[in-house]
Design a protein with these regions (language model features):
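A cross-family phosphate/adenosyl-ligand binding-site feature
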Residues: 2-158, 164-228
Length: 228
């Protein structure tokens, strides 16, 4: 399902400008400042860093789009490089999957404030540099600042940590962000699904991430006990 949806997207939008969200459609109808406060669609922030597994972030955006969840995307420059290296997609195509896209240096973006209500954030994939910044509260870009907002506002923050092996520093950072309220989610392959492809494994990880937001995308196998 997600595989077919991914390859059906070909929209290209310009890169986000500073202090301005980048809507995927008409800016007059998609500006978050003009939308009614209630009722509103669920909002989730997606941040992509330069860690490997860019496809996880792309598939997460696709799944949320399929569920009609309003998405706010922040992409680092190294995420853009990883997308180009690991996939057949251009960063502009990935940005087009989100409702809004922000420059990582835009510290005045709506998502940088706790008064802008969201239902949580996923950093996918999450580099160890980003993890360290979130742990220390060192908000030097929009990704770390928005993650800091999630923690202080007691909103769901999921960090899809992508590194192996892990040093003591990595483990300490993971422990501290967990104590602060985040969920550390290593995308461990679920071999019990008997995957037929890498994308089967990616889809299973994406589904499990969205389970943490009480969102069911379907289309992936769940454990139901030993099958005879």
């Amino acid at each position: 399902m997600l595989h077919n949806f991914l390859h059906g997207s070909g929209t290209i939008t310009p890169q986000s400008s500073r202090h301005s969200p980048e809507p995927a459609g008409d800016p007059d109808t998609n500006n978050p400042h003009t939308m009614p406060a209630n009722p509103r669609r669920k909002r989730i922030v997606i941040a992509m860093t330069g860690a490997t597994d860019a496809l996880l972030g792309i598939k997460t955006l696709l799944a949320l789009r399929h569920l009609n969840i309003e998405t706010h995307l922040i992409m680092s420059k190294w995420a853009e490089a990883t997308i180009k290296y690991e996939t057949d997609y251009h960063p502009s195509n990935v940005k087009a999957l989100a409702d809004y896209s922000y420059n990582i240096n835009d510290m005045a973006a709506p998502v940088s404030s706790g008064s802008f209500k969201t239902n949580g954030m996923v950093v996918v994939p999450c580099s160890m540099k980003t993890l360290a910044g979130i742990h220390s509260g060192f908000c030097d870009d929009l990704i770390s600042r928005t993650a800091d907002v999630m923690l202080k506002e007691r909103r769901r923050l999921v960090l899809v940590a992508r590194e192996t092996p892990l040093s003591e520093i990595h483990l300490r950072n993971m422990l501290e962000v967990t104590r602060a309220g985040a969920v550390v989610f290593p995308p461990v392959p679920a071999l019990y699904v008997r995957p037929g492809s890498v994308e089967d494994l990616v889809d299973q990880s994406v589904g499990r991430v969205l389970d943490l937001f009480d969102l069911d995308i379907g289309g992936f196998e769940r454990w139901e006990g030993w099958k005879r």
